[in-house]
Structures are given as structure tokens and as C-alpha cells.
């Protein structure tokens, strides 16, 4: 244990061995849904569900291990939710592109990430982002998580004509159990009980099973499916065709801004940013993200990156890479316990996402709302992330609005060259983004 403490510098980060383990368990619990949801989405693209689940686990295990052992950060890596839906429903079903070609486009984007990271260009781009935008990423992700939690628990539903959303059936058993989970976690947080989020998830899950809101797991263990049918099946030649190149560009920009916003947002909440709002040694988590993006299509799944649900582990006290390693171990074990892991219902982990959304609002006090050239772009980031249900749209809007506001004010010289480059990429993002 002493060797682990020294390797991860646990005491230097103001943490403890027990806290890191608890944080890893908490993070895994809130993101374990990806094991089931990712294959379910990619099945629409033609990727078989069994091998896809194994590929999801492999991508998560490799990404989390690299993040923990190399970057020493408590950020969990797994296939992104937004990108998998983009590939399945827009690229494959909408544009008629084969899933093998789509995976080839993801691989190309990953190689570009690695090149930019080695050349330190990704780091320079990040450092060109104003602090107001960086903190708005954390706030926006927080509201995004809150909205996800409200929707998954049934507290908020798709609205009728004239109203985009509406209150769910708040008196039904599933929603009542979720409300119980929210109140329980809130009470535990107020009382400053260690492991409040994880305790809340476990207790709420037991209540869900006991009240028959969701069925008890039919089995606990089972052998994972072989990944052979989809391993290494990406089509690089097809990905370089004129039809697929816009897809590769869109994937590149989506993954770039998603990862950038998530890393900075999580780092702001964890207290990792320095006095200038920069993340020290940011090239390490960025390199992990780039390598994970290359490995994912090799395994047979879509873009991987830092998960916003890592915020739950950070709130539980996770501050080192040991948290990510624990998440990796949990994912590895989950390959043999998929029936049990998949049984954890949204009513159990949804309330945790809502509470974490509250926690992530803290950086909003560091945004200067008296300077409209700072507050208008920040407001756009936060509102668009939440109301478009798309993190990338919010971030890219901020990249475009900040230079615009400074130019209008006559202070274009305050905009760094890197931000102009990000604005250009953001413009391409909106041009090529598939809106249907």
C-alpha cells in the first residue's frame, strides 16, 4: 500500500487510499450504464451487441488504466454517448455509410489527435481559451448532467406541442423512488457522510429492486462474448473517400471539443487548474485521450474520452490516478458480471447525476458577469450545452462568440491566435454538423 501511495502521490494530493477506492467505485457506478447502452445504440449501425459490449469494456479498461498510471488523474475513459449516437443514427442510418468506414474515420481522427498532442498544439489551443469560457464548461456540464439525470429518472419528459419538456408522472413508483434517491443523497451530503453518492446509489438500487420497480438481476456472472467479429474491421480506405471525409472532420471536432471541455470542467471542479486557469501537465491526459480514440475503433467501438460522470468520483474525494485504476478494474470485472451491472437502474444513478450537477455549478462565481464580452459567450456555452443536449454545440458556440464580442468591443488584440483557430474549427463544425 505504501508503494501505491508513493506512486500516485495520494497524500500530496490531499487524499487517502480509502477515499480513492471509494471514488473509483462511485465513478464506475454512475457510468456503468455505458456497458449496456453503448452496444444498444451501435446495434442500430449493424454492430452485433455481444461483441460490442466486450469492445466497450476493453476500450474503457485500457483508457482508464492509461489515465491512472500515466496521467495520474481521476478521469474515467469510456466510449462517448454523443459520438456513438452520431455514428449510429446519422452516419450509418442517415448517410448510409458502413460502420466499418465510420470506425475508420474515428481512427483517422485519433491519429490526428496524437500528432497534435506530440506537437504540443493541443496544449497551446487549450491555453488560448479564456478563463471565463473554461469555467463555463464546468457549469454547462453540470447542468447537462442534471438534465440527463432528470430525464433518465422520469422527472422530466418530452413535452407536448408548444412545450419542449414537461414534468414527468411524479406520483408513479419509478419517479417516487428516484425522488427518494435524490433526497437520500442530498441528506447524506448535507450531513457530510463519506461516500454519500455511492451509498445513495446502492440503497436506492435496493429499494428499486425491493419495490419491483425494476427486476432483480437474473444472474450475476457470465462469460463475455468474443470481440473477434468486430476487432480490427475498420475501413481506412473508405474513410478517406470524399463522402466520408466530412464525417471524419465532424468526429474530430466533436471529440476535440468534448474532451477539452470535459477535462477542463472536471479539473476546475477538482481544483487542478493553476492561478491562470490552466491544467498542469495537460498533455498527459490529452495523450491518453488520443490513444484511447485510436484503440476504440480497433476494438470495434466508437470514440472514447474522459467521461463527465467522473465528476461523481471527484465529489467523492478522488484526486489521483488510483481512482481511474479502480474504475478500470471494475470495468474488467463487469465483463464477467454484465447481467448484474446492467441491472443497476436509472432510478438509482440518476439522482446522483442531479446532485453532481449542483456541485459543478460552483465555478459560476468566477465568471465576470459585469463584462458582457466575457459573460455572453459563457452564457451561450452553458445554455446551449443544456438546451441542445449537446456538449460540443455549447463549447463551439463559445469559441465563436468570444472573438465576436471582443471585436465588437474593439479589443480583438485580446484574442489569442489559438482561439482564432478554435473559432475556425468551430465554424467548420457548424457547417458540417448533421442537423437532421
Predicted regions and their residues:
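Membrane-helix interface/capping residues of multi-pass secondary transporters
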Residues: 49-50, 75, 99, 391
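Membrane-embedded alpha-helical modules
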Residues: 95-206, 210, 325-436
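Transmembrane alpha-helix interface/packing and boundary motifs in multi-pass membrane proteins
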Residues: 63-76, 186-192, 251-258, 289-299, ...
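Helix-loop-helix hairpins and the membrane-proximal interhelical loops
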Residues: 1-51, 164-168, 198-283, 426-428, ...
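Loop-to-helix transition at the N-terminal end of transmembrane alpha-helices
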Residues: 46-65
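Residue-level signature of catalytic and energy-coupling elements of molecular machines
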Residues: 21, 41, 125, 195, ...
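Conserved active-site and cofactor/substrate-binding residues in soluble primary-metabolism enzymes
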Residues: 16, 32, 36, 53, ...
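Helix-loop-helix junctions within the multi-pass membrane cores of secondary transporters/permeases
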Residues: 2-38, 59, 80-89, 93-138, ...
Amino acid at each position: 500500500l505504501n508503494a501505491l501511495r508513493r506512486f500516485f502521490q495520494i497524500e500530496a494530493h490531499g487524499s487517502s487510499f480509502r477515499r480513492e477506492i471509494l471514488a473509483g467505485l462511485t465513478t464506475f457506478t454512475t457510468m456503468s450504464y455505458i456497458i449496456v447502452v453503448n452496444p444498444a445504440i451501435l446495434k442500430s449501425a449493424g454492430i452485433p451487441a455481444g461483441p460490442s459490449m466486450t469492445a466497450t469494456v476493453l476500450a474503457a479498461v485500457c483508457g482508464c488504466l492509461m489515465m491512472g498510471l500515466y496521467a495520474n488523474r481521476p478521469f474515467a475513459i469510456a466510449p462517448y454517448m454523443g459520438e456513438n449516437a452520431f455514428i449510429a443514427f446519422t452516419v450509418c442510418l442517415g448517410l448510409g455509410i458502413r460502420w466499418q468506414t465510420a470506425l475508420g474515420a474515428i481512427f483517422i481522427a485519433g491519429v490526428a489527435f496524437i500528432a497534435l498532442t506530440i506537437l504540443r498544439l493541443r496544449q497551446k489551443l487549450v491555453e488560448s481559451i479564456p478563463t471565463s469560457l473554461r469555467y463555463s464548461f464546468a457549469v454547462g456540464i453540470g447542468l447537462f448532467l442534471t438534465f440527463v439525470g432528470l430525464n433518465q429518472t422520469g422527472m422530466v419528459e418530452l413535452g407536448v406541442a408548444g412545450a419542449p419538456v414537461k414534468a414527468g408522472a411524479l406520483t408513479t413508483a419509478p419517479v417516487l423512488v428516484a425522488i427518494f434517491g435524490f433526497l437520500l443523497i442530498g441528506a447524506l451530503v448535507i450531513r457530510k457522510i463519506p461516500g454519500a453518492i455511492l451509498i445513495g446509489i446502492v440503497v436506492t438500487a435496493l429499494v428499486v429492486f425491493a419495490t419491483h420497480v425494476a427486476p432483480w438481476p437474473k444472474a450475476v456472472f457470465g462469460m463475455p462474448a468474443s470481440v473477434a467479429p468486430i476487432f480490427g474491421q475498420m475501413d481506412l480506405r473508405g474513410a478517406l473517400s470524399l463522402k466520408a471525409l466530412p464525417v471524419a472532420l465532424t468526429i474530430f471536432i466533436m471529440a476535440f471539443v468534448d474532451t477539452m471541455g470535459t477535462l477542463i470542467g472536471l479539473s476546475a471542479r477538482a481544483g487542478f487548474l493553476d492561478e491562470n486557469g490552466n491544467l498542469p501537465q495537460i498533455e498527459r491526459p490529452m495523450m491518453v485521450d488520443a490513444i484511447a480514440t485510436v484503440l476504440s475503433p480497433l476494438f470495434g467501438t466508437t470514440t472514447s474520452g474522459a467521461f463527465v460522470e467522473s465528476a461523481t468520483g471527484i465529489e467523492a474525494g478522488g484526486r489521483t490516478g488510483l481512482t481511474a485504476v479502480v474504475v478500470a478494474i471494475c470495468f474488467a470485472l463487469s465483463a464477467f458480471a454484465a447481467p448484474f451491472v446492467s441491472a443497476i437502474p436509472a432510478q438509482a444513478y440518476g439522482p446522483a447525476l442531479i446532485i453532481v450537477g449542483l456541485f459543478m455549478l460552483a465555478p459560476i462565481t468566477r465568471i465576470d458577469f459585469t463584462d458582457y464580452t466575457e459573460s455572453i459567450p459563457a452564457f451561450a456555452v452553458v445554455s446551449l450545452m443544456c438546451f441542445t443536449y449537446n456538449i460540443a454545440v455549447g463549447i463551439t458556440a463559445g469559441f465563436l462568440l468570444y472573438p465576436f464580442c471582443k471585436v465588437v468591443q474593439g479589443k480583438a488584440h485580446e484574442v489569442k491566435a489559438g482561439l482564432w483557430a478554435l473559432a475556425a474549427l468551430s465554424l467548420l463544425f457548424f457547417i458540417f454538423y448533421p442537423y437532421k
